[in-house]
């Protein structure tokens, strides 16, 4: 067996173990509906979250079978590594708590009536320990084999011609500066994320100190966000080292940075509301009664308030850094002759500046409202500022984020504008509902008049800011979408069928999450029932998923939006992956509540509400899984299309050589160099003539994403040129002015000609069967 075949078998074994570990975790998620269910379901549970391992393994099998998709595959391996590791640690602590709870229960065996009350409970502890131990094994196996697969993947992606192109001095300086900046941002993010992870652990410890007997992990998702940020920082640093797979690693770094940024921002949302809000509420209540055990500087409640506030700020910084690193990677990947010399239209500059100022201003207004809502003032009433922190960070980041590369700038602005538009519309509608409820609900209307008026004013200001931000984002989406539409489309095919089919999963998620939001709000205000512990529908951002679906649909007439749609799919997949744990946790909670309904006094209406709630929560969990899978497939397909270039009179793409057909699965490797055999005479090609002497022409393969189409580089005397690149961006033209009468023999003596052309190319190794 060749080394290539051995690596191929090993990575397929890793994919098999990932699928098995994911299926085991999903199967154990169903055990919660039995008598041996774990007791940590009320706060957070990670079992269903591990379905991502199944997706990773299947995508890994597919990418090796089809010989493309290395960007998505490697990114998924990194995400599976983080989630598997976090799951193993999470259930390690859960196992310890289950054992301690069993020991405490055994101490009561001598008490009267123990067998009647706790015998069934006590007999289930062995099964709970087994479930928790299996989850440790599942997470550890997934983490370990994901790590193996990452390194094995680098073994089967090989460089066929390890010669690197020489750049102009200007491009060399730009690339060197981008590398240093990316490495610096990655290092800062890496160190900051380690500190954030330690702070997350500390806050869980402090929550345990004030939790009484309920000592299970409460938040959990913030640990995963910090780990993703660590991996993203490490990937940024790794991508700046080495050359053989540098462009692949850069694109993986971009994808992981988008995932980390999304999780960090949603962590601010999840932690601030309800966890930080509850910490502040308990602290204010203790201060009101003058309890020194709460208000003293060494009290757990005081420490929690301070530490949790710092944690939220750190996650906001991590979101900004992750977004910035993604923009830097995009800028680096577009450092070609054309992009570096594209001038931004003056009107676009002015409009961009105005929109940036507006985004920052609306974000600052939201931050001010957030602080007002967190202060202990009597007149704010039920106005809560905790859920405004993450949107203020998002709005200000949208205004501050930019790039000196025109293509990257308009792509970044378009993506962030679409995200802000979806979020603003959702929050504006929710704020309008709160204004109506505050004005009409008897409990508020009959209360203190000043508080009644003040909270309506605060919610009205909040709704107004969301409306203005939505209009600003709509203007930005139209402006930058129009500019993107004007960009040249270099793809030779569109995948309307695949994208159309799987984008329905995103639409399904949008409808389910938005509908769940409406129904639960109706139950809260009309029937005074809140049947869930964690408002997962608020985390899911259904209208944003609807906006992503619309952008994906617009890729049919405007294929130049495909790159933006791909990143938006990564964002919505990350959000749905973040939400699935909270959704299934509420299913577990409602199921236990319905089982105990014979012990709890409930009316028929309440029973109906709880039955509807568990159906909606289960449907939302299913929608999260479907959306994650469909969005990943859409991104995979978009990556495939984006790395195939179109043929045109001005294109350097040529058809496959020989008798090879597209999709045949074989590929001959070689390089063809050709130079003129006769010296050039100026009278043979007058100025402005249609035929010019060619200095050289190289035929090479564009990338592992495009193994069946080739590119040629064409260099004419005295003319700058640009190589049209596929996956690995082989581009550079050096400028030089050839003199009339110059021949190929003395071209190398021209001092103005600073560069030569060459190319390196990567392929998945197992496609070569020569």
Swiss-Prot record:
Span list, region Disordered: 736-770
Top-level lineage group: Eukaryota
Sequence ranges of Polar residues compositional bias: 754-770
Name of this protein: Uncharacterized protein R07B1.9
The organism of origin for this protein: Caenorhabditis elegans
């Amino acid at each position: 067996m060749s080394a290539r075949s051995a690596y191929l078998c090993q990575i397929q074994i890793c994919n098999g173990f990932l699928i098995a570990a994911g299926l085991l975790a999903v199967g154990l998620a169903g055990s919660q509906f039995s008598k041996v269910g774990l007791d940590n379901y009320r706060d957070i549970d990670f079992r269903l979250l591990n379905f991502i391992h199944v997706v990773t393994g299947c995508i890994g099998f597919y990418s090796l079978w089809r010989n493309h998709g290395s960007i998505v595959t490697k990114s998924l391996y990194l995400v599976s590594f983080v989630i598997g590791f976090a799951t193993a640690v999470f259930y390690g602590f859960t196992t310890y708590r289950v054992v301690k709870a069993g020991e405490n229960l055994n101490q009561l065996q001598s008490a009267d009536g123990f067998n009647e009350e706790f015998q069934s409970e006590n007999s289930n502890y062995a099964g709970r320990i087994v479930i928790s131990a299996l989850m440790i094994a599942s997470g550890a196996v997934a983490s370990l084999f994901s790590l193996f697969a990452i390194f094995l993947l680098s073994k089967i992606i090989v460089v066929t011609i390890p010669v690197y192109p020489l750049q102009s001095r200007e491009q060399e300086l730009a690339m060197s500066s981008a590398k240093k900046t990316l490495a610096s941002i990655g290092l800062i993010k890496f160190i900051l994320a380690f500190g954030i992870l330690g702070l997350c652990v500390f806050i869980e410890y402090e929550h345990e100190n004030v939790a009484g007997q309920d000592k299970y992990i409460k938040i959990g998702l913030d640990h995963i966000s910090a780990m993703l940020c660590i991996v993203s920082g490490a990937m940024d640093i790794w991508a700046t080292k080495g050359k053989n797979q540098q462009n692949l690693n850069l694109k993986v770094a971009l994808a992981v940075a988008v995932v980390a940024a999304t999780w960090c921002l949603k962590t601010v949302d999840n932690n601030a509301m309800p966890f930080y809000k509850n910490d502040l509420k308990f602290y204010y209540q203790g201060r009101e009664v003058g309890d020194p055990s709460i208000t003293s500087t060494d009290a757990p409640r005081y420490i929690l308030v301070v530490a949790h506030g710092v944690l939220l700020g750190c996650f906001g910084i991590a979101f900004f850094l992750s977004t910035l690193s993604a923009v830097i990677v995009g800028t680096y990947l577009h450092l070609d002759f054309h992009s570096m010399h594209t001038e931004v239209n003056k009107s676009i500059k002015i409009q961009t500046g105005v929109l940036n100022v507006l985004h920052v201003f609306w974000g600052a207004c939201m931050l001010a409202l957030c602080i007002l809502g967190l202060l202990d003032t009597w007149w704010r009433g039920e106005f809560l500022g905790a859920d405004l922190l993450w949107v203020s960070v998002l709005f200000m980041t949208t205004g501050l984020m930019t790039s000196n590369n025109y293509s990257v700038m308009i792509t970044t602005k378009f993506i962030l504008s679409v995200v802000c538009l979806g979020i603003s519309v959702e929050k504006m509608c929710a704020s309008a509902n709160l204004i109506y409820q505050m004005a009409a609900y008897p409990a508020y209307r009959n209360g203190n008049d000043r508080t009644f008026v003040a909270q309506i004013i605060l919610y009205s200001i909040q709704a107004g800011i969301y409306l203005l931000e939505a209009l600003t984002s709509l203007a930005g989406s139209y402006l930058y979408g129009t500019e993107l539409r004007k960009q040249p489309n270099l793809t030779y095919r569109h995948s309307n069928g695949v994208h159309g089919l799987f984008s329905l999963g995103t639409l399904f998620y949008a409808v389910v999450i938005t509908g769940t939001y409406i129904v639960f709000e109706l139950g809260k205000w009309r029937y005074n029932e809140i049947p869930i512990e964690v408002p997962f529908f608020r985390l899911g951002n259904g209208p944003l998923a609807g906006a992503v679906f619309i952008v994906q649909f617009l890729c049919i007439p405007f294929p130049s939006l495909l790159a933006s749609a791909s990143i938006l799919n990564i964002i919505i997949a990350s959000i749905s992956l973040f939400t699935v744990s909270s959704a299934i946790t509420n299913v577990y909670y409602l199921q236990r509540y319905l089982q105990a309904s014979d012990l709890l006094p409930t009316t028929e209406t309440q029973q109906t509400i709880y039955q509807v709630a568990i159906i909606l929560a289960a449907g939302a969990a299913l929608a999260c899984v479907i959306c994650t899978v469909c969005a990943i497939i859409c991104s995979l397909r978009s990556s495939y299309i984006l790395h195939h270039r179109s043929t045109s009179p001005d294109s350097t793409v040529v058809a496959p050589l020989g008798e090879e057909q597209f999709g045949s699965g074989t590929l001959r490797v070689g390089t063809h160099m050709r130079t003129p055999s006769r010296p050039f005479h100026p009278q043979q090609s007058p100025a402005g003539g249609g035929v010019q002497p060619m200095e050289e022409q190289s035929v090479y393969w564009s990338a592992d994403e495009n193994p069946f189409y080739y590119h040629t580089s064409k260099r004419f005397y005295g003319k700058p040129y640009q190589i049209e690149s596929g996956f690995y961006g082989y581009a550079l033209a050096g400028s030089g002015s050839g003199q009339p009468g110059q021949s190929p023999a003395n071209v190398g003596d021209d001092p103005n000609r600073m560069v030569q052309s060459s190319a390196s190319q990567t392929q998945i190794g197992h496609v070569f069967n020569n």
